């Protein structure tokens, strides 16, 4: 099956303090000769490499080595294997190199220069430091807040059960403990979640609370997270480490230049026909492209906040289509000219476009989250048609089209997989095996199986549309929070997870094995894209605005043939 058709759019508190010191030696060699100590020069013309050793007074696995090109603001990250590391395909220029590993002090930052085609060596010796438990990745969390066990953070009881099926499913475990609200504020928050007139609709529908449950909930929140409480977070398990797999891998993050005014804030990215990576800067009201071969950026501002974007796709002619807040947004990829096609000029609230896809006839389809609809822009007529989803307040989020042009939706709030047949306008809803739940995205694999990711309770599932059979797989760590799932060309499945502070996870369906690749920085990844060479592209949505980046994971850096990204 042609991937371009179906991918077109696509932190127990344990702390101990020890004496620390870092001794680092750096030896730089700027030449193009192959060296056993420095590693082979990059196979890509004009690019360089760096390698070295990391030592410590006690055993460790998979330390993170950061190699930052300060000229282009590009960060490479690799993991040690047996105390050695290598980063390849580095742009020529000035670099800062450092090492981090939880339980050890961070190394000094070492400055080196890599010439075109050159190699360098940097060796590090770490000393013991402080171990900090892991924490889920959520925007706005204070850095370094105390982390405690679940029962300490949320004392057991019926009110906790209510929180689990309402608040935590979407917000995660660290949202409530960081509020310190009084009774009136907690009641106002619940009122907002129940307000049917809010732009996004009611998150908590009538019937969510049985008699007395809301009052019980508010009393619990005031007692545990009231004005006199302290900000705290949940200590979650560390990711399992497969050092052999991590030793092969390399991340690259391309950091976007700041705007003259205002903050950056990525949402989705999309690979393109010519290898550029297109992106949505939702906070900065931009759509744009980045050439990973040169790390150059081009922004195209949209006409206003009413066109703020979410997802992207590309049609056969090369035009980029963005799901805007109130309209289809069409960008000429060559000239940057932008056109807008409103979803519904009479809509009482913004429809909030989410995920776009192109069908076999080059019609553009989108999920409209706040309107609980899907929209179609007809290639022949230019007209826009709207189709209402069968369940109110479903919040149609991720969307995919299969090889037969059937539309598949992930209903975030009502947690269903919903199918729409454009031929007869018929809908079919499929409930996951595990409920209650929340679901962000769906994916159609090469066999037509529909995969979904359940943020809560941390599972992935597969629906066979031919038999209606559903199989689910629990992620191995509690408090996993899978967002998206995609398939690579070796038939592995890749999961974007923010549960342990952020990781990409490879799932082998045959062996049922999960391999974790911890992120470069703390973030979530709302959408991942797999290239024709099995590189995994993402955005750093919930990272600090100053650290917004387009990122890519190469599971095997020895197989990199190009820095470009196409399907």
Where are these regions (language model features)?
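Structured interaction patches on ligand/partner-binding surfaces of diverse proteins
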Residues: 102-122, 127
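The canonical Cys-X-X-Cys-His
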Residues: 163-174, 217
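Beta-rich, blade/repeat-based domains predominating
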Residues: 260-274, 305-317, 346-361, 392-404, ...
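A short, solvent-exposed beta-strand micro-motif common in secreted/extracellular proteins
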Residues: 93-103
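Short, acidic Ser/Thr/Gly-rich low-complexity loop/linker segments typical of extracellular
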Residues: 69-84, 88
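Conserved beta-strand positions in repeat-built beta-propeller and related beta-rich domains
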Residues: 277-283, 320-326, 364-370, 407-413, ...
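Blade-level signature of beta-propeller repeat domains, shared across WD40, Kelch, NHL, RCC1
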Residues: 525-567
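Short, ordered, surface-exposed loop/turn motifs in non-cytosolic proteins
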Residues: 48-50, 56-71, 92, 144
């Amino acid at each position: 099956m042609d991937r371009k058709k179906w991918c077109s759019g696509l932190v127990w508190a344990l702390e101990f303090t020890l004496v620390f010191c870092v001794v680092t030696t750096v030896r730089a060699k700027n030449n193009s000769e192959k060296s056993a100590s420095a590693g082979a020069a990059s196979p890509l013309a004009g690019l360089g490499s760096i390698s070295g050793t990391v030592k410590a007074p006690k055993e460790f696995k998979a330390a993170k080595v950061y190699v930052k090109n300060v000229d282009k603001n590009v960060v490479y990250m690799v993991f040690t294997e047996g105390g050695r590391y290598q980063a390849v395909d580095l742009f020529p220029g000035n670099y800062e190199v450092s090492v981090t590993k939880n339980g050890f002090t961070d190394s000094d930052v070492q400055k080196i220069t890599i010439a075109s085609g050159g190699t360098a060596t940097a060796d590090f010796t770490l000393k013991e430091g402080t171990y900090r438990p892991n924490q889920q990745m959520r925007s706005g969390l204070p850095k370094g807040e105390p982390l405690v066990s679940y029962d300490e953070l949320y004392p057991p009881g019926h009110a906790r059960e209510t929180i689990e099926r309402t608040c935590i499913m979407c917000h995660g475990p660290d949202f409530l403990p960081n509020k310190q609200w009084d009774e009136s504020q907690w009641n106002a928050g619940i009122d907002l979640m129940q307000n049917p007139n809010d732009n996004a609709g009611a998150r908590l529908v009538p019937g969510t609370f049985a008699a007395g449950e809301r009052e019980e909930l508010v009393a619990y929140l005031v007692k545990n997270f009231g004005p006199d409480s302290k900000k705290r977070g949940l200590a979650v398990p560390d990711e399992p480490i497969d050092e052999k797999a991590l030793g092969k891998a390399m991340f690259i993050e391309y950091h976007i230049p700041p705007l003259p005014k205002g903050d950056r804030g990525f949402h989705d990215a999309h690979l393109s026909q010519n290898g550029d990576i297109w992106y949505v800067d939702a906070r900065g009201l931009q759509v744009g492209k980045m050439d990973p071969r040169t790390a150059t950026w081009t922004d195209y501002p949209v006409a206003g906040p009413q066109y703020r974007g979410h997802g992207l796709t590309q049609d056969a002619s090369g035009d980029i289509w963005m799901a805007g807040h109130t309209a289809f947004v069409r960008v000429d990829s060559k000239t940057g000219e932008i056109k807008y096609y409103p979803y519904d000029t009479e809509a009482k609230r913004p429809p909030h476009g989410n995920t776009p896809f192109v069908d076999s006839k080059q019609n553009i389809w989108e999920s409209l989250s706040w309107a609980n609809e899907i929209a179609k822009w007809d290639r022949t007529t230019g007209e826009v048609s709207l189709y209402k989803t069968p369940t109110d307040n479903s919040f149609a989020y991720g969307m995919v089209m299969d090889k037969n042009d059937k539309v598949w939706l992930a209903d975030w709030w009502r947690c269903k997989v919903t199918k729409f047949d454009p031929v007869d306008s018929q809908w079919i809803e499929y409930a996951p095996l595990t409920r209650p739940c929340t679901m962000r995205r769906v994916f159609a694999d090469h066999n037509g199986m529909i995969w979904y990711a359940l943020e809560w309770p941390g599972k992935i599932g597969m629906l066979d549309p031919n038999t209606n059979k559903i199989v689910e797989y629990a992620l191995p760590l509690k408090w996993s929070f899978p967002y998206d799932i995609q398939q690579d060309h070796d038939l592995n499945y890749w999961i974007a997870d923010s549960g342990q502070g952020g990781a990409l996870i490879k799932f082998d369906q045959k062996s049922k094995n999960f391999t974790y690749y911890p992120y470069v920085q703390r973030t979530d990844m709302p959408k991942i894209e797999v290239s024709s060479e099995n590189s995994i592209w993402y955005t750093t949505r919930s990272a600090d605005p100053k650290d917004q980046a387009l990122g890519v994971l190469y599971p095997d850096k020895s197989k990199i043939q190009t820095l470009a990204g196409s399907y």
